Amino acid sequence: MNEYINLTLENIDEEHICCAIGDKKHQAGVDSKKEWIKSKLKDGHIFRKLNARGKIFIEYEPLETAWIPISGKNYEYIYCLWVAGSFKGKGIGKELLEYAINDSKEKGKSGICTLVSKKKKPFIGEKKFFEHYGFKVVDTIGDYELLALQFDDSETPRFNDSARLMKIDNKDFTIYYSPECPYVEYEVNELIEYAKENNIKINFIKIDSLEKAKNAPCIFNNWANFYKGEFL
């Protein structure tokens, strides 16, 4: 039987968070992600991982407090479900998702939802996997789709109006980012240095609050690029 661990205030400092394990260049990002998780646990944030060294985890929380430009009542939102490498094909993804579904039902939720894409994109779940468990498309913006598994007849979640804009007024290259991903901090610092060395103007906008996340001008999980005002 597989052994899983849910991160808590008591164990998070000793546990790894699956991504960037042992990678010193991403340590600052790992530390930021851990602090972010600590701040979110009070909201019901769940980070559940296989007790192993690898990228094998699910991360979700109530949609009302999730840093994503999606709104809905009494739903859980899955940020990420990742099973990588040799752990694939062993039913671990199934166990992680079923845990989240059952946990949501036990909490009296109306359903659970997640972001996918019609086309394969990095760091976004596979649509077919979720559809196998009964998730259905409830809203769409371009190639991006909001999937939901309903437990009752209540209204399904929707993308916020701000996310439907998919554009900004600033015409310079602009990056929106958040501490939700441990890889982000290193990449931002690298881009800042690259921009300085090559005299390129890049605007960096940090999403560091629930309000900013809910009002993001595009589909936003933890990173978004704009150029000449258009979402890339």
Residue ranges and their predicted role:
Residues 7, 142-165:
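C-terminal "cap" of GNAT-fold acetyltransferases
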Residues 65-78, 88:
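A conserved beta-turn-beta hairpin within the catalytic core of GNAT-like acetyltransferases
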Residues 83, 89-104:
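Conserved acetyl-CoA-binding loop-helix of GNAT-fold acetyltransferases
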Residues 104-120:
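Conserved GNAT acetyl-CoA-binding A-motif
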